[in-house]
Amino acid sequence: MPMKFEFTFSKSHRPAGGSAVLLQVAGAKEPAGVAVVDPEGVLPKAAKIGKFSGKALSSLDIVAPHGSPADRIILLGLGDAAALTSHDWLKAGGAAAAKLRSADKATIFLDAPGVDVTGKAAADFALGMEMNAYAFDSYKTRKSDDESKSAQKVVKVTIVTGMVIAAKKAFATVQSIGEGVFLARDLVNEPANVLGPVEFAARAKELEKLGVEVETLTEREMKKLGMGALLGVAQGSSRPPRLVVMQWKGGKAKDKPLAFIGKGVVFDTGGISIKPASGMEEMKGDMGGAAAVTGLMHVLAARKASVNAVGIIGLVENMPDGSAQRPGDIVTSMSGQTIEVINTDAEGRLVLCDALWYCNDRFKPKAMIDLATLTGAIMVALSNHYAGLFSNDDRLAEQLLKAGTTTHERLWRMPLGKEYDKMIDSKFADMKNTGGRHGGSVTAAQFLKRFVKDTPWAHLDIAGTAMGSPTDEINQSWGSGFGVRLLDELVRANYES
């Protein structure tokens, strides 16, 4: 059942029935709120019998004892108080949400003895609850035998904390982050028959309501600009491509923007170099990079970030009809460099190279960061727990690595070098679009590097993290929204005036 939380922050609250969630750190004698919900003092014995010690994400769920104003009590562990991070508070909120699926109302006692609970921690806890509750089920006509399509469960949650004012302020900000993550998840989860390039562009245009300037380049306009690489990918589909440019002008007029570029292949059959049938349905998510960029632009605008930012997404469909490009074709990119197409399933880099060149040529950004579900090779190297980071700039790379650690959207830096560059030299053109099996994610990044000049640039290969990654306390969705929180943290920590 779709679930939504309505939050209230309060310094004190006496439950009138419902569930009470009491947080406790490892080693503490008692949890938060015990004086309110356990007047008879039975919780210590229950915790002992249930072997609950406050270990991170551990829980004990009991019927409320006689005399309690609550109907149900959930003890939830926070772990080591000294080591708590923002991500830990998110996970704790997600764990609480998972326990409250059958609840109608709940009281969360946040101020566990032994831990300094800030307003940001309270807000992160609430965001974690929302992230856990996200579900994409709009195409299910019935969720269960006794449930109509329109049913949505609303759980009223009171979060009890001494930092009410700070929590409310922080939650207003983190809610915008949640909205951006959910937008990215929605876009990745949407089926390709519903979300083509034109429809995706229309979704991006809705950001104008938040003050984002949005323009959409048509196929004709891209032809005039000479985007032969991007258009070559699109020519096998009856659905026309689009290039969407989103601008958020929250900084000083003279400041150069920070640029984010996303691969938006709304469905990838592989083209003439067609993919195997098994698992091909997941290629509706091959626009995870574009989804993350769109979600990020939503966040920056919604929270009125004091930065100038540009988001550019190249939207195409890679199909194998009679007009599709062939292995051996040579296309001319916007940069004037020619590319021999060895494998039509190495199409994302063809989309990105024109988008990167266009961005650099038009906006002269202070830095460019692209996101793409680019290679299966990165999944071989890193599985789906880290995204690959490639960069020509150590400072930018370190900023991204730190942001990844903070948000737990983790990155692992991969190499670039002349040796890899030689692997994409072509006998017939300036370069070829794949260097073969060995070092596949590296040669893909090396290809993109040829289109960024000397601008500080980073490439995030999110093929293993944007979709189908393992579920956890804050993500129960196939499409994860990976990259939105990471890049918002990057902006917040390094680029806002």
Swiss-Prot record:
The active site is at residues 275, 349. Mn(2+) 1 binds at residues 268, 345, 347. GO terms for cellular component: cytoplasm. Pfam families: Peptidase_M17, Peptidase_M17_N. Coiled coil: none annotated. GO terms for molecular function: manganese ion binding; metalloaminopeptidase activity. The keyword Hydrolase applies. InterPro entries: Leucine_aapep/pepB, Macro_dom-like, Peptidase_M17_C, Peptidase_M17_leu_NH2_pept, Peptidase_M17_N. Belongs to the peptidase M17 family. Presumably involved in the processing and regular turnover of intracellular proteins. Catalyzes the removal of unsubstituted N-terminal amino acids from various peptides. This is Probable cytosol aminopeptidase.
